[in-house]
């Protein structure tokens, strides 16, 4: 007759030890006797098997098997058969559920909008799996819905879940089984197993069971010779006791024995056997007790406090290294337990820095592995009709481009080119877009093509063709398929043609030979996961017809759930795991990280589809049990802590931090205070405080010691108090060949000041030439920051250009369109009519827009809309130009007038050369948007008009002019005055105005829109185009700028405001001609000074600060110069904003006259 036994006792009382001793004794007495089965959680099976393997008297076992529930069922089916259905993996089930959601979307009441999300099918799969574990069928769900009054949302929710659940069961019926279905069939077939009837079964490592597992235990108790269950409980069945969970499990086991009329034997374990000292015994015995006696701690329990999470992990790593060195412990004797996933990620990066071997007992998603990323990108390329982003991701995985040397470099060139040309869709297949000559036109600064660059461009084209050919073959194979099976076959055959299987296996072997066993294993699992997903699709959906889109969606769902299952790479390594899941029994040293409130105890929340209230109501009405609710789980938090800390036999270290990764404040766990209260002398060790008083505690590993040394030496250089130990450590490491490696790089960072080297004159000439031919903007760029000039014109770094409309593109368009129209009407805007404005605008745009960025403005609906907006802006601009011309005596004389030292035609203007202090010529070139002139008797006056599409840049700031940050307008005026004969101007030609015209889309704001009429609106629109800049204060010039000037008149076309007495108000922007000439002369001196500095080789990172702003904010070279306010602020040049530039120039002029 069967027996049901329960081994109960507190943690460390020897339950598992007694079980193993019993089994080993039986094995020694009769090695080939009746089977012995140990059922344990998956995480524990390897450890239990090792117990038998390591026993020298056994050397393994033929009689005893360590299995989890699912493996036991497979073992029985191997014996008796009966499982004819195909096994449906987790991925297969999720694919089925996703397909059901799409097929029955219209029948859903609540979740229609969620069906398109892959994550929702995973969530629904979890909920259905939960129902199966607790023996709830779709019929029971539907019955509950029909028989009970429910809130509408709850009713709709359960209806949708039941609907999907029922359809899933129908698809599985007679064809497939899930893991839960396998266990139900196992229960049905258990009676037929002769092997099981002879077996003695031990169940260890569990604290509670699901309804399905209880049913298995009940059936095992009926069939097997004996069943013994080990539980960590003292038998206290108080619902609020520490052992609530396991005592509840014990009650269920007793009910099974009573229900089946089976002998039930309770064996209590009371003697502590695990703990090697009184500290841990007292901790286990008194934790969570209301009444306890305090004990004196003997140093086997530590509590560490750190400032932040990273330092907490570093402190634990240092302690492990110290114990390994001083106490001669092995890494396999150490376990680190955490609750917050943040710690797992940190340990993965920190522990290798300390050379600590470790194994983290978690499953990682395969999603981000390069091979998986390549597969998913390939799917997205097909689904998105060859979009840029997935295609470039495909290239960047380097999986399909392994055969190309420097494939990353070639991919970068390809990406730059494709970004600039806007290659997408079918353009990838058009050879005219991928010619070597086209590649050489790439970028803003084009360089002559060398043989080497030509060869590189050819390799880029070859690489692109190689990958595109593979995608085309893959796309063609999919296009010929129409069922799940044919799609899966096409998929695999395409990858076979890619030679991918052999490539990956070769790579795996190379990784193994190089000692990178984990990476090799990951590669293996990724490929097997890929094949498994294809098999699942072919098996589950078979010959069912489906669209390519549906197949790719289902395939992506399958890939999404793939996870790595990594086995330990060595036996001597630190075990790392979650406090909730890790099975780490009898470790000598346990570290419990993250002992903060909110983590331990954790604020439990229900993340499932069904809320806790819905669960409780369901359980009350149906008398069926479901998975525990959040409030029940919350009651077990002390038990989680208890189980974790009692895994240690020698030492426990608790740690917590005062700040999280996001600098959020953290509170210590209340359990820490509870633990401290158990002892008379258990203090908290602040790691930072301890390190300050004894720096040697930080010096456990060379790499980490160097980092800490760097921080301490930095404090020392800043005249902060530093322990002598650090300076001694520095000297010791400096003179040790092994320890000094890398030290120089760290110490050089201490004195790093981002200082550049001044070029010698020969190198300057090699970079810039023996004369400077440059635009005005180049000199302005140097004045903003010398290093910016060095990178752009010395190193000639080429910033990436993109296939999109930039601000400078808009400016070029407006310049070209206005030049085209001005030439058509011979510069006379006054006679334009609304009809002629519309006609000329359309004609100009039709001629000019197709030339912009490879016809960018016709590439999409958005850019076609932008073309319409550009046309509207041009029409508004022409209306404003007509209005301004009507009231001005100045007439346009030239448009887009270029200038240089040696004009190539009579159309160009000549610019006199300047000379640096080294005698090098400065030849300035550029283009003046518009030159307006006014002739009066024997004098001519000149207006320089510059079109700006940015309102910010369309302001003449005389302070910036003085400092050489704004040199354009004075340069243009100087060039025009030099060329009065070429422009047929009078012998006496003087400045009229230096004015900016803001080309923009006008917007009108009214305080009271009810009072607005069309005339007022038009008036405000025209006023928004008012010219801005500086005007000659000569009365004749003022009258010519606006013929309507009179007292109390403020011009709406130029910056002139006349007062009541005919004088100019302060808001007028005017200066006499002598002042303008002084600015022109000062501007020339700025050119000479800047050019001289350039040829002297100045390259320093020294941006000029103006109005609390640095040019770095919009600089494209920040990633090159590494400008840092902490390091470089002392080198910033600052504009004196208190100066009056006009007064300062006049003062300098007076001083020159006195000399």
Swiss-Prot record:
The EC code for this enzyme is 3.1.-.-
Family, according to the entry, reads as follows: Belongs to the helicase family. AddB/RexB type 1 subfamily.
Provide the residue positions that the database annotates as binding ATP.
9-16
One of the record's GO molecular function terms: metal ion binding
The record makes one more remark, namely: Despite having conserved helicase domains, this subunit does not have helicase activity.
Q: What is this protein called?
A: ATP-dependent helicase/deoxyribonuclease subunit B
Question: ATP-binding as a keyword?
Answer: yes
The UniProt record lists the UvrD-like helicase C-terminal domain at 270-584
The residues that the entry says bind [4Fe-4S] cluster are 785, 1112, 1115, 1121
Alphabetized UniProt keyword annotations: 4Fe-4S, ATP-binding, DNA damage, DNA repair, DNA-binding, Exonuclease, Helicase, Hydrolase, Iron, Iron-sulfur, Metal-binding, Nuclease, Nucleotide-binding
Q: What does this protein do?
A: The heterodimer acts as both an ATP-dependent DNA helicase and an ATP-dependent, dual-direction single-stranded exonuclease. Recognizes the chi site generating a DNA molecule suitable for the initiation of homologous recombination. The AddB subunit has 5' -> 3' nuclease activity but not helicase activity.
Q: Which GO terms describe its biological process?
A: double-strand break repair via homologous recombination
Query: Which species is this record about?
Result: Staphylococcus carnosus (strain TM300)
The record places domain UvrD-like helicase ATP-binding at: 1-278
How is this protein organized at the quaternary level? Heterodimer of AddA and AddB.
Identify the Gene3D superfamilies for this entry.
3.90.320.10, P-loop containing nucleotide triphosphate hydrolases
């Amino acid at each position: 007759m069967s027996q049901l036994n329960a081994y109960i006792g507190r943690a460390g009382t020897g339950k598992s030890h007694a079980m193993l001793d019993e089994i080993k004794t039986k094995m020694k007495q009769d090695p080939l006797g009746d089977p012995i089965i140990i059922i344990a959680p998956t995480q524990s099976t390897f450890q239990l098997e090792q117990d038998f393997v390591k026993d020298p008297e056994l050397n393994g076992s033929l009689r005893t098997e360590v299995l989890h529930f699912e493996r036991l069922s497979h073992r029985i089916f191997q014996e008796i058969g009966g499982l004819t259905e195909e096994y449906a993996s987790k991925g297969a089930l999720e694919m089925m559920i996703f397909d059901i959601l799409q097929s029955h979307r219209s029948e859903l009441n609540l979740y229609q909008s969620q069906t398109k999300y892959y994550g929702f099918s995973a969530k629904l799969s979890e909920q259905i799996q939960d129902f199966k574990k607790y023996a709830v069928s779709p019929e029971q769900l539907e019955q509950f819905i029909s028989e009970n009054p429910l809130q509408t949302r709850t009713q709709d929710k359960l209806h949708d879940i039941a609907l999907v659940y029922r359809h899933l069961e129908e698809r599985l019926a007679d064809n497939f089984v899930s893991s839960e279905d396998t266990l139900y069939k196992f229960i049905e077939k258990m009676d037929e197993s002769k092997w099981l009837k002879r077996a003695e079964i031990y169940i260890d490592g569990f604290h509670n069971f699901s309804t399905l597992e209880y049913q298995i235990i009940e059936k095992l108790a009926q069939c097997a010779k004996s069943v013994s269950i080990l539980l960590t409980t003292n038998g206290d069945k108080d619902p609020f006791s520490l052992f609530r969970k396991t005592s509840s499990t014990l009650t269920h086991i007793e009910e099974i024995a009573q229900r089946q009329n089976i002998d039930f034997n309770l064996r209590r374990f009371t003697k502590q056997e695990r703990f090697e000292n009184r500290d841990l015994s007292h901790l286990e015995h008194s934790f969570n007790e209301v009444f306890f006696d305090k004990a004196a701690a003997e140093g086997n329990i530590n509590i560490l406090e750190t400032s932040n999470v990273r330092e907490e992990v570093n402190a634990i790593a240092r302690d492990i290294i110290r114990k390994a060195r001083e106490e001669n412990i092995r890494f396999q004797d150490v376990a680190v337990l955490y609750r917050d996933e943040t710690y797992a990620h940190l340990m993965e990066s920190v522990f290798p820095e300390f050379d600590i071997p470790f194994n983290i007992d978690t499953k990682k998603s395969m999603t981000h592995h390069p091979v998986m990323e390549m597969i998913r990108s390939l799917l997205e390329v097909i689904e998105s009709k060859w979009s840029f982003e997935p295609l470039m991701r495909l290239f960047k995985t380097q999986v399909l481009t392994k055969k190309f040397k420097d494939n990353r470099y070639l991919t970068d060139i390809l990406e730059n080119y494709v970004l600039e040309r806007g290659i997408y869709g079918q353009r990838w297949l058009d050879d005219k877009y991928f010619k070597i000559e086209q590649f050489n036109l790439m970028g803003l600064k084009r360089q002559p093509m060398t043989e080497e660059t030509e060869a590189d461009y050819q390799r880029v084209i070859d690489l692109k063709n190689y990958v595109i050919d593979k995608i085309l073959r893959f796309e063609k194979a999919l296009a010929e398929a129409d069922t799940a099976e044919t799609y899966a076959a096409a998929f695999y055959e395409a990858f076979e043609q890619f030679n991918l299987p052999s490539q990956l296996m070769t790579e795996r072997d190379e990784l193994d030979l190089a000692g990178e066993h984990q990476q090799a294993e990951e590669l293996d699992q990724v490929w097997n996961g890929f094949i498994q997903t294809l098999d699942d699709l072919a098996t589950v959906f078979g010959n069912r017809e489906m669209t390519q889109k549906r197949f790719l969606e289902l395939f992506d769902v399958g890939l999404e759930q793939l996870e790595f299952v990594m086995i330990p790479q060595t036996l001597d390594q630190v075990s790392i795991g979650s406090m909730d899941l890790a099975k780490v029994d009898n470790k000598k040293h346990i570290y419990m990280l993250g002992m903060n409130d909110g983590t331990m105890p954790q604020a439990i929340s229900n993340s499932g589809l069904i809320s806790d209230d819905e669960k409780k109501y369901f359980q009350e009405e149906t008398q069926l049990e479901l998975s525990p609710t959040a409030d029940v789980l919350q009651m077990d938090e002390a038990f989680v802590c208890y189980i974790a800390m009692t895994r240690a036999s020698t030492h426990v270290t608790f740690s917590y931090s005062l700040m999280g990764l996001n600098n959020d404040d953290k509170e210590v766990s209340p359990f820490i205070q509870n633990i401290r209260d158990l002892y008379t002398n258990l203090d908290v060790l602040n790691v930072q405080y301890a390190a300050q008083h004894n720096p040697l505690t930080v010096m456990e590993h060379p790499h980490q010691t160097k980092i800490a040394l760097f921080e301490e030496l930095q404090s020392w250089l800043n005249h902060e108090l530093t322990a002598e130990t650090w300076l001694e450590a520095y000297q010791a490491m400096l003179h040790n060949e092994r320890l000094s490696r890398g030290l120089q790089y760290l110490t050089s960072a201490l004195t790093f000041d981002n200082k550049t080297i001044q070029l010698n004159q020969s190198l300057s000439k090699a970079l810039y030439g023996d004369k400077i031919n440059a635009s005005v903007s180049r000199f302005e760029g140097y004045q903003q920051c010398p290093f910016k000039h060095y990178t752009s014109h010395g190193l000639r770094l080429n910033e990436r250009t993109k296939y999109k409309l930039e601000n400078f593109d808009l400016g070029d368009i407006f310049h070209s369109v206005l030049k085209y129209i001005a030439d058509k009407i011979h510069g006379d805007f006054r006679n334009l009519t609304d009809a002629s404005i519309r006609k000329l605008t359309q004609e100009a745009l039709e001629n000019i827009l197709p030339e912009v960025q490879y016809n960018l403005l016709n590439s999409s609906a958005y850019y076609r809309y932008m073309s319409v907006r550009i046309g509207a802006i041009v029409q508004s601009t022409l209306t404003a130009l007509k209005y301004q011309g009507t009231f001005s005596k100045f007439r346009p004389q030239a448009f887009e007038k270029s200038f240089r030292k040696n004009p190539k035609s009579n159309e160009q203007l000549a610019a006199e050369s300047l000379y640096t202090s080294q005698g090098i010529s400065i030849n300035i070139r550029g283009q003046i948007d518009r030159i307006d002139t006014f002739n009066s008797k024997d004098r001519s006056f000149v207006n320089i008009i510059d079109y700006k599409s940015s309102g910010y840049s369309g302001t003449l700031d005389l302070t910036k002019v003085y400092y050489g940050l704004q040199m354009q307008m004075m340069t243009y005026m100087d060039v025009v005055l030099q060329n009065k004969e070429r422009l047929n101007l009078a012998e006496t030609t003087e400045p009229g105005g230096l004015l900016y015209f803001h080309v923009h889309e006008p917007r009108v704001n009214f305080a009271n829109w009810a009072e607005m009429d069309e005339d007022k609106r038009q008036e405000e629109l025209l006023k928004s185009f008012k010219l801005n800049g500086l005007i000659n204060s000569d009365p004749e010039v003022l009258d010519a700028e606006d013929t309507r000037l009179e007292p109390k008149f403020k011009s709406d076309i130029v910056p002139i405001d006349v007062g009541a007495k005919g004088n100019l108000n302060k808001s007028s922007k005017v200066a006499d001609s002598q002042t303008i000439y002084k600015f022109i002369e000062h501007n020339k001196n700025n050119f000479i000074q800047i050019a001289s500095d350039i040829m002297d080789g100045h390259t320093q990172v020294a941006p000029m600060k103006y109005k609390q702003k640095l040019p770095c904010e919009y600089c494209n070279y920040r990633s090159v110069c590494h400008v840092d306010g902490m390091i470089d602020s002392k080198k910033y040049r600052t504009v004196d904003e208190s100066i009056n530039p006009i007064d300062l120039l006049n003062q300098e002029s007076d001083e020159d006259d006195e000399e």
